[in-house]
Amino acid sequence: MKRLMLLTLLVVVVVPAVPVFAADDDQSIAYFYPLRTRRPVIERELELRVEHEKARDGRSTTVATAIELPILPRWQVEVEVPLVFVDPREGASTAGFGDVSVESKVLVWRSLKYLAAVALGVEGRLPSGSERRGLGGEAAIEPFAALGIAVGDFDVLGSVAYEMNVNAGVKGPNEQELDASAALAWRVHRRFAPLLELATVTRTRGDNEDGLRHRTQVYVIPGFNARVFPGTTLRLGVELPLTSARTHDYAILGGFVKEF
């Protein structure tokens, strides 16, 4: 797994440094906006993201602001700053800043003929939130791959990622998770597209206090995209568990995306 992480980091660092690009680098494929799955697209956007979860031990809401900027035609960097609200079933509610994340993504292949693309990247999470107050405090590295293709009025996206906790002071084995998801959207109108996602999470390493180690969580996410204004998209959906292995009973996922 260390070799996989090093290979991903090498691609992310080396590929953007190549000065020669194809003539169509200023063109992009306009895939829809999924709710969990990553997009293989270089973006210039400002986004407001909201996630509300209801679990057995209480509720939590995360409101995050993210900016995505292209550094080079095939290299993008994203910074996300979250504000977290925690309302436990027992104990006092808390609120504050969560863990800031920084993501680097490289478009390694794209075909305008087939409307297909592949991207590789890595996300780093900084432990800026308070672990004691339940607002974060996790340092992690997450290499990922994303792919997409458009066929007629349908977009198909998929992504896979491996998250590794790197907190130095954690007792016992640091947690690691494999995430995989796929999303399908139907462009019934230029301003509206219903979507459906399937997401899986498998904890491969870490403690087993909640009984989720080596068990695969499966979630289904129905939702939609709506083009509410020129260059502005609303995405909204509900994440529902399909297995007894779960971290929450449901989650409401949403966001406003502003292209600039």
Language model regions located:
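Transmembrane beta-barrel domains of Gram-negative outer membranes and organellar outer membranes
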Residues: 22-260
